[in-house]
Amino acid sequence: LIWDKDEFSLFIDLGTNGEMAITDGKRMIVTATAAGPAFEGGPGKAVAGSDMVAVTAFLLKEGIIDETGLMAGPYFEEGVTVALSDAMNAPGSSDGVYLTQKDIRDLQMAKAAVRAGVEVLWKKMGCPEISQVCLAGGFGYYLDVDAAAVIGLLPEKWKRYTRAVGNTSLAGAFQMGKDLWTGRLQEERLNKTLQGIESINLAEQENFEEMYIRYMNLQSS
């Protein structure tokens, strides 16, 4: 459990909604943002959200899109098909994904909302040195962290602290039940921990809109 650690940890679970939390082991601040379908692969897309991040980073590196997300030349009207073997450096994969300008814009909006949310939490906690970034769920398990940094979904400086933690809702509930049963976690301490959780509404936070607009760009930061 991330509040068991006497260090600053960030937790991110991405899907149609993006749930985020930051803790120093005692205090915890949580929030959520609507990411839309982009991190689920988009409507009608037979591709995972983590693949969308990798493909977008590939298009950026190849100059097919620029930092504003604009597709070059004929791709703006026609879209582009990208082989996952190229985007994800996975030789032998014959799968490809077709993306339009709208797909890129959808990903930009989702990415901006999550990155701005992360920054709000970080600043609310006092801009600490982050010791670990935990990515939950299937998205986090398969996410290419380098690609996430290339498009600015995560700060470049946090790459080496980032790790996938799997199905945390199930694992966390199991671990908590086990710790309560064995006495490792006392009910009094659990209640105190829960009382120390602060939930914030991103729309009400100062400079959130400004950060959201800034992070629409696809660039490392």
Q: Regions from the language model: what does each represent?
A:
Residues 2-51, 144-167:
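Glycine-rich phosphate-binding loop of actin/hexokinase-like ATP-binding domains
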Residues 3, 175-221:
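Acidic, glycine/GT-rich loop-and beta-edge segments that sit at the periphery of enzyme/chaperone cores
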Residues 54-109:
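Gly/charged contiguous loops adjacent to phosphate- or pyrophosphate-bearing nucleotide/cofactor binding elements
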Residues 2-6, 26, 57-65, 119-126, ...:
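Generic secondary-structure signature for well-ordered alpha-helical cores
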Residues 14-16, 72-79, 129-140, 190-204:
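A glycine-rich phosphate-binding loop feature that marks nucleotide/adenosyl-phosphate handling sites
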Residues 53, 111-119, 170-174:
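Short, hydrophobic/amphipathic alpha-helical packing segments
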Residues 24-29, 127-192:
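Catalytic phosphate/nucleotide-handling subdomain of diverse soluble enzymes
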Residues 106-128:
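Phosphate/ATP-binding catalytic cores across multiple sugar-kinase/actin-like superfamilies
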